[in-house]
Amino acid sequence: AAVPASASGVLLVDRAAIAENYRILKAAFLEKAVAAVVKADGYGLGAEQIVPSLVRAGARSFFVAQLDEALKLRPLLDRCHPAIALYVLNGLTPGTETLFADNTILPVLNSLGEIEAWSRFAQQRGTAQPAAIHLDSGMCRLGLPPDAVERLRGNPGALDGIVPTCILSHLACAEEPDNPKNAEQLAYLKQALTALPRAPVSFCNSSGIFLGRDYHFDLGRPGVALYGVNPTPAAPNPMRPVVRLLARILQIRAIDAPQTV
């Protein structure tokens, strides 16, 4: 590809490589279900261009960070396939319940307050509402902390009207296979799951997929590895490169070695 005369550079995005990376990750996940994280406009590479390739490669669940991202992608996903689950990682903000429900978008419930609001909305509508529930197993970013999980254990009615489609958590140090934090999070997650209704579990991010079968559960959730970033920094990159930058050379000069540049 040539650099247009009006541009100083061009970034090429290889959608076939993204699809191949999805297949590589699915194989590493032992051919179980693998979602695709396409937040921040597909990590800046263009979600609307990337999503159809991922659907053709087999992705049936997608994660974004913000509701506005999901609202933009929902029509495209519906055109690509009739049964695509679309999750919003940043959860349910006040007043957005109807937008989620009417557009078939699934909130990831990160707090007891969000669970209460979604349950109340379901009861007002008179129909059960699907959602994911996020447990903080040690990342300390989003999700229900241990005390909130124990409150749910003691009050299962808090989930009235909610159909958990997925229970997720996030590994903090998966790119370091020998980090004891990984095993600590796994042990806590197994214990915390006993407080909740049975549902598919999503624990593995890109690097987590390569930690092995014990960490896999039901649904992989890779992000950066889809776009060519090495999920195993201590080993060769198993992913195909996705982006290539072409830049125009502005000037070539010969100078003497003592001169500064």
Question: Which residues fall in each region the model found?
Answer:
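Alpha-helical scaffold segments that flank or form the walls of functional sites
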Residues: 21-23
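Anionic-ligand-binding alpha/beta catalytic cores of soluble enzymes and soluble regulatory domains
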Residues: 178-261
